[in-house]
Structure formats: C-alpha cells, structure tokens
C-alpha cells in the first residue's frame, strides 16, 4: 500500500506542469503561493529569472531566483511553460522578453497589467496569452483619481456610443468612480445589449439606464436630458470607418456634425456642467470625410466655449488597439483564415494605444478643462503597419511570407501614410499630466457664423452628392485636402454604385 502511494505521488509530480517565472516581484510571489496551496492547479514552479542582480540566489517560497532574463535559453532545469510576471513591464520590455521566450520554443503567457485587474488580484486564473496590447500599448497610466472623482462621484453621467470600443471602456472606468447614475446611449441594439448586461453583472452598485437611440434624433435627446439631467457628457458616438464614410459622406455629416450639435443644444438647455468630445488625430489636416467632420465638431465646441456655462473640451488621439473594424482584428481574421494578410502600403504608420489607456486619459483630460480646450494624448512613437502584421503572424506561431503571405493592395481613399497630431495654426502646450498635451489655437470662431457654415454643410449632405459635401467641408475647413478630390472617375463610379444599390 505504501509503495502504491509513493508511486502515485511520483507519478503526480511527473505530470505536473513545470513553470518558469520571469520577474521576482509580488506577482510571482502570489502565484507561487497559490500553486503551493492549491493541489488542483497541477503545476509546480521550478525557477525564477529576474534582471535585478541583487536577487539572484534568493528564493521565493523555496523557489530559486536563477539569474537574468536573457539566460532563459541556457537554463538547464527542465520546464514546460514560461509565465511573465511583470505587470508593470512597458511594451518595449515586453517585446524583448517575448523574443527571449520565443527562442526557447516553449509556450509562454503573461499576467495582466494592473489596469486590467479591476480587483487588483494576480492569480493563475488571470494569466493569459500575450496580446498585441502587450507589445504595442502596454503603458501604465498614472491617474489623479481625486480630480476625476470630483467631477464624476455622485454625478449623473451620459455616455454616447456607450456600447462601442471607447464608449464601453469609458463606462467601465466611470463605474469605479461611483456616479449616481450612468446613462448609456447607443443606436446599436447589439452593442447596447452587451454593455447593459455587463453593467448589470458589475460588482459596483451603480444605477444605470440603457437608452436605445440616435444622437441625430433631437427630440429624443431633449427627452433624455429633461428626464435625467446629466451633469457630465462623454460624447463617443461617431461614424469612424474612413473608407465607408468616403462613400457615404452625408452619413458622417448627419452623425459627426449634426449629432454633436444636437447634443450641445441639449447640454445648454438642461445645465450640463462638463462635455467631453472624443475626437481623432484624423481631424488634423484631414484628407478624409471622417477627419473633416470631426474637425468641424472640434470647432463647434471651441466656439461655443467662448460664451457658455458648459465646460466643453475635446480629446484627440490615434488608433486604439483592438477597436472594432480596425487593422489588428482584421489582420487576426486574415491569419485565422490562412492569409493573405493585406497591407495597403509598406510605409504606412499609425499611432497606437490600448483602449483602457485611451479611456483613462479621456477621463483625466475631462478633469483638466475649463472650456474650449483640445487635448492630445501622447501616443508614443508611430508604428509601421507592416511590423504589426509580422508580429501578429508570429504571435500565432507562424512565419510571415512563409506560412502566411503578405499582399500589398495600395492605399484606400482618404488614407494618409502618416497621421499628425496638430494643425499648422496650433501650438502644443504641456499640462500637469505627462501624457496629455493641450492645443492652443489663437483663432476664435464666431458662433453665429459657425452655425451658418454648419447649416450649409448639412444642407449639402441632404443632396446626397459626394462632390457637394466635399466642397462645403473644404470651404469651412481649408486644410481639408481630399486625396482624390480631382479624380472625377472615382466620384462618378462611387455615385453610380450608391445610386444603383
């Protein structure tokens, strides 16, 4: 009987997954302790690597710290998987660590960043695959929670586009500041259903009200504002897909311009304190309809701020990683289907940040504004789209150009090779947050003159004529340079396609 027990224990030890930890800090300690105290996990930690030389030779719960991370491929102890336990690692550090892990041929996973851990607890359950966010957008955001709390805690907060990529992340972050009411407005039934369900399952006991509706509907907005009287508006609802809006410019005008104006009118009538417009770097020297309409929206809030009790501000930033319809999910789908991965231009670059980072910085910028500011989020360095495609293919365990082919299809209408963060007549000023910059524009806009111009743009949109919409936008936004404005064949072809459909 004793020998049977011994052989069973030996067999159990053999079948346990041998883990090697990267990082000898608190996260490793928690996971080692959890594995030690829980037999159900069927794992054992055999060693730790850490770049802090003073830790080498020490142990954590009996597990030795063996040496620096770069020695991973030389480790003689057998192991099955690497767990990266550095939640504060930057994207640059993560790229280095992942490259070292790949050289071993063994599987590797990571603990989440602290911003992902709502309850702050690291555990084996929270360990996940390395994602593109880790390699591109893993930058921890230092928040002044007191200043954010001052304008959200106990207040009624309306989020438009509440079920979208940015809107839903704003909702999640707002929940942690305990508003008295969260009003979730979205015209997508599917998105609203999802964020409604998520809020109802949230541990934070915050009242919320989902509203299915469109910001184009002025009467609905006045009904919502008169019923709930929001104190704060986060305006994230917008049409954002560049090629689609090139073919349907009137839709961008009705939503991105007229919808914003409708919200502003309701905010004026019902005593909103703070209004934060979610904008885009595509509004800078725009070459596409989406960017031009968002630039008009920025001008609306800048002009209205001159003589309003509402504190209007805009927050401008680049691409968010994983946003619906954006390049990364598209590449991932192409890789799952066996390729090819389609890239518009090998030189194309974009700024990227994670959705959680963008939402947190929007909340922070919202605390700063006194009215009329356009804030720009520091996006770090632009990333080559080709590099992203290659990295995603490698993350899938495949080799670019070998397992998955790359196809260059040429830039689409309205696309720039490089995005910009400021217009020619804007000066960048620092704020008291290292990742938030402020645009100073000396050019004021007369509100009545602005309304006349906006009316001309919306009137042109009602004609459903691409050229007329582009011309009216160009008149108001002189820096708007449609990259195919002189291409009559493209305009005729697109117009015919729309009419025939």
Language-model-derived ranges and their functions:
Residues 3-110, 114-119, 190-194, 201, ...:
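A solvent-exposed beta-alpha-beta segment
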Residues 40-42, 175-181:
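Conserved S-adenosyl-L-methionine
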Residues 56, 94-156, 268:
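Flexible, Lys/Arg-rich cytosolic regulatory linkers and terminal tails that connect or flank
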Residues 95-111, 181-188, 227, 232, ...:
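NAD(P)-cofactor binding segment of oxidoreductase domains
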Residues 119-120, 235, 239-298, 303-305:
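Conserved Rossmann-fold NAD(P)-dependent oxidoreductase catalytic core, especially the SDR/UDP-sugar
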Residues 142, 147-151, 299, 303-320, ...:
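Strand-loop microenvironment adjacent to phosphate/nucleotide-handling motifs in alpha/beta enzyme folds
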Residues 157-175:
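N-terminal Rossmann NAD(P)H-binding glycine-rich loop of SDR-like oxidoreductase domains
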Residues 212-232:
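Conserved Rossmann-fold cofactor-binding substructure of NAD(P)-dependent oxidoreductases
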């Amino acid at each position: 009987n004793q020998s049977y027990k011994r052989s069973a224990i030996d067999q159990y030890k053999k079948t346990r997954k041998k883990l090697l930890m990267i990082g000898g800090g608190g996260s490793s300690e928690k996971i080692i302790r959890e594995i030690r105290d829980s037999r159900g996990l069927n794992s054992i930690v055999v060693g730790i690597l850490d770049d802090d030389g003073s830790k080498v030779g020490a142990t954590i719960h009996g597990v030795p710290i063996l040496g620096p991370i770069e020695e991973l491929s030389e480790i003689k102890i057998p192991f099955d998987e690497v767990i990266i336990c550095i939640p504060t690692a930057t994207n640059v550090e993560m790229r280095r660590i992942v490259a070292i892990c790949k050289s071993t041929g063994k599987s590797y996973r990571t603990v989440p960043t602290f911003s992902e851990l709502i309850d702050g607890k690291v555990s084996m359950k929270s360990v996940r695959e390395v994602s593109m966010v880790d390699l591109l957008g893993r930058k921890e955001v230092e928040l002044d929670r007191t200043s954010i709390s001052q304008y959200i805690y106990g207040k009624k907060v309306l989020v438009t586009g509440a079920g979208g990529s940015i809107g839903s992340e704003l909702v999640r972050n707002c929940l942690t500041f305990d508003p008295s009411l969260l009003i979730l407005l979205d015209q997508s039934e599917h998105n609203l259903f999802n964020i409604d369900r998520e809020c109802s399952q949230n541990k934070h006991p915050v009242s919320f009200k989902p509203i299915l509706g469109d910001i184009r509907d002025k009467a609905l907005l006045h009904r919502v504002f008169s019923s709930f009287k929001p104190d704060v508006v986060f305006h994230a609802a917008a049409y954002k897909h560049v090629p689609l809006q090139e073919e349907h410019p009137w839709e961008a005008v009705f939503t991105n311009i007229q919808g914003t104006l409708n919200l502003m009118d309701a905010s004026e009538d019902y005593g909103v304190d703070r209004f934060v417009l979610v904008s885009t770097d595509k509004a800078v020297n725009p070459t596409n309809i989406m960017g031009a309409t968002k630039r008009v929206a920025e001008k609306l809030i800048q002009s209205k701020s001159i003589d309003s009790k509402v504190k209007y501000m805009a927050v401008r930033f680049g691409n968010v990683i994983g946003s619906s319809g954006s390049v990364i999910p598209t590449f991932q789908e192409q890789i799952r289907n066996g390729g090819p991965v389609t890239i518009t231009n090998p030189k194309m670059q974009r700024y990227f940040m994670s959705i959680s980072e963008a939402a947190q910085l929007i909340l922070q910028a919202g605390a700063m504004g006194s009215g009329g500011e356009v804030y720009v989020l520091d996006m770090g360095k632009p990333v080559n789209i080709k590099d992203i495609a290659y990295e995603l293919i490698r993350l899938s365990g495949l080799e670019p150009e070998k397992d998955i082919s790359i196809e260059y299809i040429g830039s689409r209408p309205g696309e720039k090779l490089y995005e910009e963060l400021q217009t020619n007549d804007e000066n960048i000023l620092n704020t008291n947050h290292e990742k938030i910059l402020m645009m100073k524009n000396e050019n004021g806009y007369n509100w009545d003159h602005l309304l006349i111009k906006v009316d001309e743009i919306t009137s042109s949109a009602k004609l459903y004529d691409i050229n007329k919409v582009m011309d009216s936008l160009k008149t108001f936004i002189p820096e708007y340079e449609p990259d195919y404005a002189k291409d009559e064949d493209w305009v005729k072809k697109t117009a015919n396609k729309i009419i025939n459909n």
